[in-house]
């Protein structure tokens, strides 16, 4: 879990344009501790520290433990797309499937 945790922390921090120092300061942690979380496998942060980081980074604490490594906004966009897809008429769904097949062949 920690390797994924470190990756998620680093990715979110960079997406938010935060340095290690700035995020650590905002979450009430030391810069070195945050570096350890991002880079070492053996770290086991407390629930309080994870909650502080989640609050600063704008995600729910369980995000750090989810297997889906996509950023929250990417997941939100995917979810919105599929909700919209479900409401389409059958002909429109078929057109989208054909477009998708065209993209698959091109890659």
What function would you assign to each model-found segment?
Residues 28-45, 66-69:
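Recognition helix of helix-turn-helix/homeodomain-like DNA-binding domains
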Residues 1-15:
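A short, Lys/Arg-rich alpha-helix, primarily the initiator
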Residues 17-37, 52:
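Short alpha-helical DNA-recognition segment
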Residues 8, 19, 46-49, 60:
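Residues that mark the N-terminal boundary/hinge immediately upstream of a DNA-recognition element
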Residues 28, 48-63:
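DNA major-groove recognition helix of helix-turn-helix/homeodomain DNA-binding modules
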Residues 68-107:
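Interfacial/linker helices and their anchor residues that mediate assembly or domain coupling
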């Amino acid at each position: 879990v920690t390797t994924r945790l470190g990756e998620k922390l680093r990715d979110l921090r960079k997406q938010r344009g935060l340095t290690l120092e700035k995020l650590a300061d905002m979450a009430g942690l030391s810069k070195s501790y945050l570096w350890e979380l991002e880079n070492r496998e053996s770290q086991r942060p407390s629930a309080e520290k994870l909650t502080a980081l989640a609050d600063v980074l704008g995600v729910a604490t369980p995000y750090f433990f989810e297997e889906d490594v996509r950023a929250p906004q990417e997941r939100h966009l995917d979810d919105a797309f599929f909700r919209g897809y479900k409401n389409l008429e059958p002909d429109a769904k078929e057109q989208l499937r054909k477009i998708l097949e065209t993209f698959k062949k091109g890659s």
